[in-house]
A protein has these predicted regions:
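A cross-family "folded-core" feature that marks the main globular domain of proteins
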Residues: 1-185
């Protein structure tokens, strides 16, 4: 409780009160799993670090505190899980951060493959901006808040002048339609 209150004050975050229970419950579960020899690997850890950098740093601080207080050795994977608790509590539970991370990861995979195994420079400003756009796109997609733009003329110009990018977007569109059964316009 003290840590969450400290984060609220230090970071100026408005957190839903549900974080007190969900985070405490997660910490106790993680310690219990560790005592039973079970370690969960956070498959989205890299995405969490990139998409929710501030929350991940908070998760690392909490991880250090938990390890010291309870004299355990929880892994950095837990810091990623802790970060998601803060992300979800920040938005009052509206955001499904796990699903957003998956969608962003799927789109990044398509972009990397489409452009011949292109590797992103994670510390690049353009990459960070791209991630931010993908994150907000995924959030709007999940809440079906995508808006149709009636300006077909602009669409035609973009489609003709940026054919390669349009091809990549088409692949993303097809994946989203197939995977999530929701057609975007």
């Amino acid at each position: 409780e003290a840590f969450v209150n400290e984060v609220k004050e230090k970071e100026g975050m408005k957190l839903n009160d549900s974080i007190y229970f969900s985070l405490s419950d997660h910490i106790m579960g993680a310690i219990s799993r560790l005592e039973n020899g079970i370690r969960l690997q956070n498959m989205l850890l890299l995405d969490i670090k990139q998409l929710y950098h501030k929350e991940y740093e908070i998760g690392l601080e909490l991880l250090k505190k938990v390890n010291e207080t309870f004299e355990v050795d929880l892994s950095a994977d837990e810091a990623g899980f802790f970060a998601l608790h803060f992300v979800n509590a920040e938005d009052g539970g509206k955001t499904d951060s796990y699903q957003i991370s998956i969608i962003v990861h799927q789109i990044l995979d398509i972009v990397e493959k489409y452009y011949d195994n292109m590797e992103f420079q994670e510390d690049n400003l353009y990459y960070q901006r791209f991630l931010t756009h993908l994150k907000y796109f995924a959030q709007r997609f999940l809440h079906k808040e995508l808006h149709y733009d009636e300006n077909q003329e602009l669409f035609k110009i973009i489609k003709e002048q940026y054919r390669e990018a349009y091809g990549c977007v088409k692949m993303i569109y097809l994946m989203m339609e197939e995977e999530y059964k929701y057609a975007m316009t």
